[in-house]
């Protein structure tokens, strides 16, 4: 099974294609300066790494170039995008709505959009990436992975700020916790390296 992992910024698109059977990275790369002059893509596969200029008016064109790099030339790592079984999208803010990763639907996209005031630089970029991927990859299943989900079990005494409660009620102002995907990975690995019990 091959999984494409995506991390979109407002003007960037990081990607990594992983063969889950052997947990091997088949390729990885970065599209930069999307929507600006002098866009570029750096693609690495088969021991070959190259940065080339490109024209990326939107994330859709960037995704199309990623597909081209993965399926042609020296950086080719698959014959066709139909080999990709699923796509994972990093989404920075899931607010109180998303406590775990979930399959992306129109309703999920709308909810991520509603949460954009909590992450105005990141969530809109995540939506751009999801919508662009849908155009390029069609019906490939896509999953949203939320940075905030790891921290969703914090009790109120840990997440409430010493500010008027109405800010929480009206605007959702509270501690959420970030970089949860990194914490989720590092926690069990740390226990293993320190030879501690995981329970």
What does each model-found stretch correspond to?
Residues 1-3:
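Extreme N-terminal starter segment of soluble prokaryotic enzymes
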Residues 6-11:
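A short acidic Gly-Thr/Ser loop motif
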Residues 12-56:
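Short glycine-rich, Thr/Ser-proximal phosphate-binding strand/loop in the N-terminal lobe
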Residues 37-85, 129:
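Conserved active-site "lid/cap" helical segment
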Residues 76-122, 150-158:
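Short beta-strand-loop/turn "lid" adjacent to the catalytic site in phosphate-handling enzymes
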Residues 115-191:
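Active-site neighborhood for divalent-cation/phosphate handling
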Residues 192-198:
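Conserved small/polar residues in nucleotide/adenosyl-binding loops
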């Amino acid at each position: 099974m091959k999984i494409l992992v995506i991390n979109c910024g407002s003007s960037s698109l990081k990607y990594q294609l992983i063969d889950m059977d052997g947990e091997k990275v088949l390729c990885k790369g970065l599209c930069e300066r999307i929507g600006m002059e002098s866009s570029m893509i750096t693609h690495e596969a088969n021991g070959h790494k190259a940065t080339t200029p490109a024209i990326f008016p939107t994330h859709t064109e960037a995704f199309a170039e990623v597909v081209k790099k993965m399926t042609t030339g020296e950086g080719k790592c698959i014959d066709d995008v139909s080999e990709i079984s699923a796509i994972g999208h990093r989404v920075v803010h899931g607010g109180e709505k998303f406590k775990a990763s979930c399959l992306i639907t129109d309703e999920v996209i709308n909810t991520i959009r509603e949460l954009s005031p909590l992450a105005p630089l990141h969530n809109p970029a995540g939506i751009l990436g999801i919508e662009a991927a849908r155009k390029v990859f069609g019906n490939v299943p896509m999953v949203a992975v939320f940075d905030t989900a790891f921290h969703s079990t914090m009790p109120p005494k840990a997440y409430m700020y010493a500010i008027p409660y109405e800010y929480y009620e009206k605007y959702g102002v509270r501690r959420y916790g970030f970089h949860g995907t990194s914490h989720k990975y590092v926690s069990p690995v740390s226990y293993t390296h320190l030879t501690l019990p995981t329970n």
